[in-house]
């Protein structure tokens, strides 16, 4: 979508960094799919790094290489960003608001960064997705700390929000272009996958998200009853709280 074929964006010898958002459903399957394309276009496994943003809440780190062939799995690096390690950060640029932006070196040094992430409603950002897996999750402790706050109850998801504007500016400054945007379905399923230029893919995924996960009503309900049709395996109270927050 609004971007040349991946075949035209990469050549043998390029260093490729796959940034995978922690909330992405079927992430291992998506990593396998992206790798199969990269391999077909001559990219070496040892030139590929899978980079996971820092965790704001406690949780495990599944091996996103699990579905890759054994030989490939051993060659592709899997790293979780540590914002406390200042040596892992590099200076990107200064925003129009005077904010100095630091990002993970593996991301900055990549010839081709590819973003794989879920799109969803977010009380602070409006919509999670696009570059929100990169900033602040692949930045400094200070950047992550500044991003944590209460949602904007007075704003609708499509309204302008300061952090969303910051995220979009950071993505523009680093020149990131290629993204795989995922709209979640029930459970760990996938409703839609949009691949292409990051802004176009994000906007199209947001449109599908609204069509799939919103239910217009004539009046505000006084009570909502929610049924959970499966156990809590893979879920946490953080996700429950986030769902309640965006539903306010």
How should these model regions be labeled?
Residues 51-62, 83-88:
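Short, conserved secondary-structure transition motifs
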Residues 204-248:
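Long, well-ordered mid-to-C-terminal structural blocks that present hydrophobic/aromatic surfaces
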Residues 75-220:
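Conserved, well-structured core segments that form the ligand-binding/active-site neighborhood
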Residues 24-43, 240-248:
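Histidine-anchored nucleotide/phosphate-binding helix
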Residues 14-25, 49-55, 225-227:
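Short glycine-rich or small-residue beta-strand-to-loop segments that form or flank ligand, phosphate
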Residues 2-17, 40-45, 215-223:
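Glycine-rich phosphate/diphosphate-binding loops that line cofactor/substrate pockets in enzymes
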Residues 22-24, 118-121, 230-231:
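Short glycine-rich anion-binding loops that position phosphate/pyrophosphate groups of nucleotides
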Residues 45-56, 79, 181, 248:
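Short internal beta-strands
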């Amino acid at each position: 979508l609004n971007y040349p074929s991946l075949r035209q964006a990469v050549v043998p010898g390029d260093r490729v960094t796959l940034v995978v958002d922690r909330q992405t459903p079927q992430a291992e399957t998506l990593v396998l799919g992206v790798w199969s394309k990269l391999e077909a276009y001559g990219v070496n496994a040892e030139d590929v790094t899978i980079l996971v943003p820092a965790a704001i809440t406690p949780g495990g780190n599944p091996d996103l290489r699990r579905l890759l062939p054994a030989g490939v799995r051993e060659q592709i690096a899997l790293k979780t960003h540590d914002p406390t390690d200042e040596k892992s950060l590099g200076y990107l640029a200064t925003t129009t608001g005077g904010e100095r932006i630091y990002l993970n070196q593996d991301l900055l040094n990549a010839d081709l960064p590819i973003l794989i992430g879920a799109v969803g409603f977010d009380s602070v950002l409006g919509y999670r997705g696009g570059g929100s897996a990169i900033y602040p999750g692949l930045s400094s402790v200070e950047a992550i700390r500044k991003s944590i706050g209460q949602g904007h109850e007075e704003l609708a998801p499509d309204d302008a929000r300061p952090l969303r504007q910051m995220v979009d500016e950071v993505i523009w400054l680093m020149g990131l272009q290629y993204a795989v945007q995922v709209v979640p379905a029930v459970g760990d399923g996938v409703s839609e996958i949009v691949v292409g230029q990051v802004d176009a893919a994000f906007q199209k995924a947001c449109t599908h998200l609204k069509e799939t996960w919103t239910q217009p009503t004539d009046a505000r309900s006084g009570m909502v009853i929610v049924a959970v049709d499966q156990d809590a395996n893979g879920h946490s109270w953080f996700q429950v709280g986030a769902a309640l927050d965006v539903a306010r």
